[in-house]
Amino acid sequence: MMISVLPKTLCLALLSGLMASTAQASSPLDLNLTRWAENQPFKAQSLAFVPGSDGTQRLAASVKSGLLVLDAQGKQLAQLPGSFQGLDSRVSGSQVLVATLDNARQQAMLTRLDADRHSWSKPVYVPVRDYSVAGLCLYRDEAGNLFVFLVGEEGKGEQWLVGAGDQLNDAPRLVRHLPLPPNAEFCQVDDAAHQLYVNEQNIGWWAYPAHPEAHVARQPVALREPFGDVKQAAGAMAIVPGGLLALDPRGKALHLYQQQAQGWTSAGELSLMTLKKPEGLSVNQGKDGLQLLVNDNDGERLYQGALGWTPTPVPVQAALPGVLPLAQTQPVARQGDAADDPAIWVHPQKPALSRVLGTNKKQGLLVYDLTGKQLQSLPVGRLNNVDVRPGFMLGQRNVDLAVASNRDRNSLSLFSIDRTTGELREAGEIPTPLTEIYGVCLFKPANGELYAFANGKDGSFLQYRLSAPNGKAQGDLVRRFKVETQPEGCVADDQRQRLFLGEEDVGVWEVDARADQPATLSSVIKVGDVLHADVEGLAFYQSEQHDYLVMSSQGNDSYVVVDAEPPYALRGAFRVGLNAQAGIDGSSETDGIEVTSANLGGAWSRGMLVVQDGRKRMPEQAQNFKFVPWADVVKTLSLP
């Protein structure tokens, strides 16, 4: 390594250790730093480029001077008085959204900067936390929702919804808590890759999924010796497409990391030995490389410079289109993996009085109205899947019937539905020889008979003819067949007398639903680029115009729609996203789904889609079910 020092100038050159994949693989990597704003009357604890300004304007957060907008020479253009530290920003239309920590109030603060008029909007504050907030960073998701991550002492972290589109929310909403490393102070988010980066001072840098519906997980970007190449400490970071720049404040070094399809590799290390304690870092990507701002020793000295490094951007998967839930059920009364499968009962005279049924795998069957309010709870055991059909003779009474798979007794639990009030009552139980029952679905052909298909973890399917001639439910086993691996979701097309069934790691099959026909499997769609394992819930949308099969693609938190007739043309995939205006989170890790084409009134005039939500956010609670207007799915996927 060769270092030359000029008056007020640092020239640092790295001649080796570059990745072969970078544009500079065969050339020296030069970082030229010069003192910046040396004679200006402020001391900045945090420094950042104003996004969209081509590096000509900078933001500074100062404990004594407030929040500042500065020109390229460090001259003040605007000031928001106060005591601040920590900075992040995002372009918002013609303005810039700025997040910082207000030291006087001990709260995260957000404001809008009009960079042309050099004026600030009225600040919005995240509520006071019960821990000391050390750092913060912004994240904008694929739908334009704006979040702030808070990094606190002793491993505390939170994600807050603070805006949507170009607007800040008057009242930020807590989305979820995050277990973060102890001794974390800095974070950054790669919006395109939905990656949150957090430092752990004595260990290294970590990457977490940033999406609010993502599961909590982390993977290392780089670690301290002897596990990695970091000499002493992991500090501040800056992100550019395909790359991460990170400071070792005690080892006085700048590390460069190239993102790969899986993980990160070192692209080099630059010595900063002439600095006292490099603590802050901001990067602006230009045509000829990177512009850098470095904060040394708590703002005692500020540096700017250029780095001739252009990391290779990693391809990012295109975002799936999204629809928004308009309603959600109350959370189930059990924690963990509890809510599972919904069904929709349509009131024969008053559709607005229809019901949504939902299974609780740790309790029983739940009944909701169309606003999501719980009306009934039937604690009959660990129910997995549920399905509904109208018109079942329970002795001399004509009722509608719900049937659920009961994992406590490997049986089918039957429930009568009063056709006037919608009230559910237990109506009997049918034992099965399955050792681990999973799914169930109903089939009612034109002759009026009612059949139940029950499946087990070993791939077995049992078809029962249901009846209750004396008021006591009974099931006659009329057919058996089997798939090779674990199934669960299934749904019948009564009109065409077909059964669709999901094999979790394989795909979806179609088979003749008639009891006297051979069970010859025909492939509908395989697990692959569109449908991701596990294949969970299946639902059948039937209308006078088109019939569709809807599938829960649990592996990537999405839903796939295909035509319900051969050749089963793919119509698209979508996600259920966060409804910021209604304060309803999106859905993820979905098990069961259900759909109806019935006109239930209002937003549900073209039908309703119900999906189980495996990760309840905003606030974090037990699992529940989300209600989506089918009309929005039609519009989003341009369904005929």
Task: Give residue spans per PLM region.
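Gram-negative bacterial Sec-dependent N-terminal signal peptides
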Residues: 1-24
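Sequence/structural signature of beta-propeller domains
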Residues: 26-640
